[in-house]
């Protein structure tokens, strides 16, 4: 079977299409402890350090709410570690992030290893050792990624329990879970927690945990009593946060144990953000609202994501001396 046909078979065999909202139900009482983390972005060493810190048992549950891949150097290793843990009997659930969705879209509709997301995932994989992207074996590559494609295609976009909801980017609290739009749960930057006063009965009394939007001070952000943002910006802060939801204990690991993040950085970042991309983002959001095509919306959202990454990199470079201040 030639490369193109084989690739189509791999994607057709997956049960879940990525343009549908899949919701997985859980019962929190089935687990002793429930840990939640997000947006690891290829920071494999931080992930291992966090696993060591939380000392995950088979009676526990680990929920990763999206964006293992891209930006960092060891995305593939994290996926492999997760799969190994599952095979060893650990309870690990993964929610698709926008970067996984981009990865699947590009792998399905184009040749692999063409864009940054694919490269970031597979650059350290067995069949892709040549960094210039010129020499890789298509058939061997497909054999290697088949398990990952099937796993990701069957991951949910939302996990809902009796007391908690987990989602990558956010929710529209005016819509029930089954009516959420893929664009919202994967990409939104809206401050949806401000909509609590109009939320539906489905959300009352439930905690919501989300990632996607990094907290620049490297800490889990309590938006309301029930809504928490847990993306600590690991790909550029080198801080990874995790919360055990039953005890509400927050756990943090750092690449450098002597790094601290002054609270002023959050304010500084917002000033740079407004200066660099506010006008651009506003214009692009207008385009999104004026487009009926879902494909065109995703293209614009990808463009926004690339622009955000540029700003974050510029921010880190400009203020790196503040990041390395000794405690």
Please report, for each region that a protein language model flagged, where it lies by residue.
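N-terminal active-site segment of His-dependent metallophosphoesterases
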Residues: 3-81
């Amino acid at each position: 079977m030639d490369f193109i046909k084989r690739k189509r078979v791999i994607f057709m065999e997956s049960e879940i299409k990525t343009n549908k909202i899949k919701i997985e139900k859980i019962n929190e009482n089935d687990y002793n402890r429930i840990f939640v983390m997000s947006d690891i972005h290829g920071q494999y060493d931080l992930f291992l350090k966090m696993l060591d810190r939380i000392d995950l048992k088979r009676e526990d549950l680990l929920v990763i709410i999206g964006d293992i891949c891209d930006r960092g150097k060891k995305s593939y290793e994290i996926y492999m570690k997760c799969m190994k843990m599952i095979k060893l009997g650990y309870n690990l659930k993964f929610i698709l992030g926008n970067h996984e969705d981009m990865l699947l879209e590009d792998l399905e509709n184009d040749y692999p290893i063409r864009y940054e997301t694919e490269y970031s995932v597979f650059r350290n994989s067995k069949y892709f050792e040549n960094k210039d992207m010129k020499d890789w074996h298509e058939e061997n590559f497909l054999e290697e990624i088949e398990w990952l494609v099937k796993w990701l295609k069957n991951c949910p976009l939302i996990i809902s329990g009796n007391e908690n909801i987990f989602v990558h980017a956010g929710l529209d609290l005016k819509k029930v879970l089954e009516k959420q739009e893929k664009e919202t749960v994967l990409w939104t930057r809206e401050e949806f927690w401000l909509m609590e006063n109009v939320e539906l009965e489905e959300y009352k009394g439930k905690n919501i945990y989300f990632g996607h939007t990094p907290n620049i001070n490297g800490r889990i952000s309590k938006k309301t009593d029930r809504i928490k943002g847990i993306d600590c910006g690991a790909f550029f802060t080198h801080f990874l946060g995790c919360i055990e939801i039953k005890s509400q204990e927050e756990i943090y690991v750092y690449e450098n144990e002597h790094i601290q993040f002054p609270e002023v950085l959050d304010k500084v970042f917002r000033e740079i953000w407004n200066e660099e991309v506010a006008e651009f983002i506003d214009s692009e959001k207008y385009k999104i609202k004026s487009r009926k095509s879902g494909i065109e919306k995703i293209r614009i959202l990808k463009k926004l994501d690339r622009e955000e990454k540029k700003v974050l990199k510029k921010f880190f470079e400009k203020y790196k001396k503040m990041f390395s201040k000794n405690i």
